[in-house]
Amino acid sequence: MAHLQLSAVAGGGRPAAAGGGGDEMEDVRLLDSYDEEMGGGAAAAAAGEEEEAHVRVTGMTCSACTSAVEGAVSARRGVRRVAVSLLQNRAHVVFDPALLKVEDIIEAIEDAGFDAEIIPDTAISQPKAQKTLSAQFRIGGMTCANCVNSVEGILKRLSGVKGAVVALATSLGEVEYDPSVINKDEIVEAIEDAGFEAAFLQSSEQDKILLGLTGLHTERDVNVLHDILKKMIGLRQFDVNATVSEVEIIFDPEAVGLRSIVDAIETGSNGRLKAHVQNPYARGASNDAHEAAKMLHLLRSSLFLSIPVFFIRMVCPHIPFIRSILMMHCGPFHMGDLLKWILVSIVQFVVGKRFYIAAYRALRHGSTNMDVLVVLGTTASYVYSVCALLYGAFTGFHPPIYFETSAMIITFVLFGKYLEVLAKGKTSDAIKKLVELVPATALLLLKDKEGKYTEEREIDALLVQPGDILKVLPGSKVPADGVVVWGTSHVNESMITGESAPIPKEVSSAVIGGTMNLHGVLHIQANKVGSETVLSQIISLVETAQMSKAPIQKFADYVASIFVPIVITLSMITFLVWFLCGWVGAYPNSWISGTSNCFVFSLMFAIAVVVIACPCALGLATPTAVMVATGVGANHGVLVKGGDALERAQNVNYVIFDKTGTLTQGKAVVTTAKVFSGMDLGDFLTLVASAEASSEHPLAKAIVEYAFHFHFFGKLPTSKDGIEQRKEDRLSQLLLQVEDFSALPGKGVQCLINGKRVLVGNRTLVTENGVNVPPEAENFLVDLELNAKTGILVSYDDDFVGLMGITDPLKREAAVVVEGLKKMGVHPVMLTGDNWRTAKAVAKEVGIEDVRAEVMPAGKADVVRSLQKDGSIVAMVGDGINDSPALAAADVGMAIGGGTDIAIEAADYVLVRNNLEDVITAIDLSRKTFSRIRWNYFFAMAYNVVAIPVAAGALFPFTRLQMPPWLAGACMAFSSVSVVCSSLLLRRYRKPRLTTVLQITVE
């Protein structure tokens, strides 16, 4: 069959049709007739992705034949439009590739009794606009900031790559790229060419999934899998990788579910193939374990070979019998020297091969790293020893040989790297603990033919789909975010929110995936699964934060870029100074009595300088601390979006609090309703509730709730036929018809009821619209405001009707948190759109002197900028949509976790628990973190500043002690481990409690 050519077409596009008349004219079935026949259904469906195919149809003799072809093709699911030309023997079909394949079109025509084949070179390709994708890769072999800079530089130079961020501590890289220019395999190849290991983890594509397979052993198994997937409707593309037993599938989630794909694979293969979703976080953990195991294997191999070398050099010469054996000749060489040469060669070029490969690739790309230093030091020692051995073999004069130096350096470096891998693994414990919260399985309830749930099926929790009804047993984890549809229980949400008290759950209660059901059986309907769950978003947020770079990291990046060249230069200077001084007799020969000459004496100093220098400690100082801190913050309900936010928060001078929902509980309650006209109170409440019912503001909800209870309190919730009514149904009976509703931010709402204008809002709203407020109402309003209550004024047909008093209780911890901030040297500010009297009354209760009232949402950002003018660092704490401009404008935005998605998106911190204590925790944690980072930098710098001169022999004239190169290598290995361990001390962080918060002082 000819090669298929497809093209994407716009939803409403139609191919041109020839027209004419008479028997000679072409009989064309226009697409319009198909649209009419389908009642517009195809047109509506055409909004999705479409492709078109041109098919040659033979055997048609009349218009009845064209109708038969049209009918056969149209009957197939996924066909959008079809036009058949009798004279041209051609059919033009527009279809959804997710629901239908070209082979199905051919089959439909042939089943109708005609021959069909695809016409090549007739379809004009119209490629889709490719979106930018974000992919995550695990990158192995990075040891310092220079490695990170090297990988980032290579990635950013790739054609099609829009941006790249690489994190040393997590060994992860995130790449934003254009899939039409470059694919993930090419990105992996580029990273590997640079001397690092790379593996793809996950992509931002929502309709792509990676399945792991068991039972995929032979080519027959692969063919079976291909046949199964080809027959599935809804699959756009798949790629089977038999080597690693994985299949990557791009599918239409509206046409087919993930569970259906897995079931089809297992059923179609008669159970020979088992499919499971590859969890990228679990793969990351397994990669960590694999890296540690690989490093341990290299270390064991190196120890197995190096220990005999050490004994031959240090111990055996003192045992006469063994010494006599080692001094025996094997050709021109002593047996001991030959054994050391063989053993060390294996260590140098087999065990140490990774250093050579990494160093070569780094140099090839114009960068330098720790591997370059290790290779230089060990190679210099090895080459000298080989030359000395050969020189002694052919001249009879045997200079000292230092084979053990290169072997011991490699061994100690591997030991240090192994400890570093283990320590770095500890820094990601927070992510691992969050991943462990994800349940492995879920109990899916299945319906019978009558629609009743009669059967249970245990499935992989990753296969849960939106709308599934799941059974949650006591003591088991909630498998996905959802809503309780049956049952009551208490759920422990402390692992997500930090709240220790169990939360009661009943019908309509929201539940969070990963939380623990304590007692009672629940049936829940899943509404968010996979990457959309709260737990997945927290994991993603923490992981993103750990990948981000704090601005202070730029210092380490700069030092790393020049570190290795400087060290090599210092090593050469060290060699030349000692060698030239020895050449001219500037120091006595007794200093080099243990060596053959000043050349070897100087070379040992130079090698020690090369291998003792450690760029890794500098590179790990910031990312490991940030990684631990973000994990610790997540454990305490404080989610940090990046190292830059951590760095800014340590220097916060002002914390601005939004009033409603931040300082207050956000649970407004109507305390007073007073009418100042002849209107009945019930009618007044109905009027106000009708106007506010369309608003999402907390005060509006309080007003509607108050009116509902006023009218229905004590009345049985039943209708005339005795059936219980829902609250929504009863409320709809109460409310009046509203027209032209509009919410006025910072003022209130206005609408038309019975054709007359209704205003519900603050004093500004009614006075701006020319409504006169009587003196008695004004006095009543002032009394409300002086008692920290918000007054809501109501007018109907431009006449003042009445007002309502609303209070929003303060959070219990608000006053103590404000006092604690003052003790920390932070100035609290309250910002609100409420009137001045109410604002000042609330501020007085919590102890805030700086109040900004009657501020519109847009003006909140202006207040932030005004405080920033003198260079102050400003933090903003809020929860609503109207806070998002101020959150974005602030140096540090903190969104209350119960707030809106927009506010959370604009913030730098998310306070999951909706508790103001966490504002103090966020600032205190950032201060502790950067105190630790500064200590890490001090240690890393001090180590190199002190160690390099000592290795260069600065103390030798006074102590007569020369640092052996292998000992220098050990020092280098342990320096980076010590920095990681220093960062791990942040795991001991304990957040300030309300009982001790007042003891906090400015650091």
Curated annotation (Swiss-Prot):
UniProt gene name: HMA9
Tissue-wise expression: Expressed in root vascular cylinder, vascular bundles and mesophyll cells of leaf blades, and anther walls and microspores of stamens.
Protein name (record): Cation-transporting ATPase HMA5
Enzyme Commission designation: 7.2.2.-
Ranges for domain HMA: 51-117, 133-199, 207-273
Disruption phenotype: No visible phenotype under normal growth conditions, but mutant plants exhibit increased sensitivity to elevated levels of zinc, copper, lead, and to a lesser extent cadmium.
Principal location class: membrane
Family: Belongs to the cation transport ATPase (P-type) (TC 3.A.3) family. Type IB subfamily.
